[in-house]
Amino acid sequence: MMKCLLIATGERVPTWVAQGFAEYHKRLSYWLPLELVEIEPSLRGKNHDPQQAIEDEGRRVMAALPKQPYAVTLDVKGKSLNSEQLAKRMEHWRGLGRNLVFLIGGPEGHSQEVLNISNERWSLGPLTLPHMLVRLIVVEQLYRAATILTNHPYHRGK
């Protein structure tokens, strides 16, 4: 079975985000075991260099990657998918036989190094979302995609 990681920059999330993530993580584990890897964010303050923070976080993300992963980067410039399209992508990813990694960056996004290793870029749409909330949305959408593939009634669709 392939290994699936969600590598997210940021360690302290609100309790309600952690609880929501835990619920969908538990539900998803039946179809797709997912491991959350939290990356320590770079310090930010009024004198911080955002580019340096991006590069530092990028190095930590790269160090956390398994060998030869299929990397799906959450990126505002990525491709937006509806739930059915995501289910088809999930089916494709499962058939690759490679470790699957979803990458969530920090407040300023991903380093160029991380973007360069990405096999796909996925956008959650044009809304600006708190990066801590993205992990909850991603795990819920992966669960929804799994239920679509198995005709589970969670996704009522069209």
Swiss-Prot record:
GO terms for cellular component: cytoplasm. InterPro entries: Alpha/beta_knot_MTases (IPR029028), RlmH-like (IPR003742), tRNA_m1G_MTases_N (IPR029026). S-adenosyl-L-methionine binds at residues 74, 105, 124-129. Gene3D superfamilies: 3.40.1280.10. Its EC number is 2.1.1.177. CDD domains: RlmH-like. The keyword Coiled coil does not apply. It catalyses: pseudouridine(1915) in 23S rRNA + S-adenosyl-L-methionine = N(3)-methylpseudouridine(1915) in 23S rRNA + S-adenosyl-L-homocysteine + H(+). Specifically methylates the pseudouridine at position 1915 (m3Psi1915) in 23S rRNA. This is Ribosomal RNA large subunit methyltransferase H. It comes from Xylella fastidiosa (strain 9a5c).
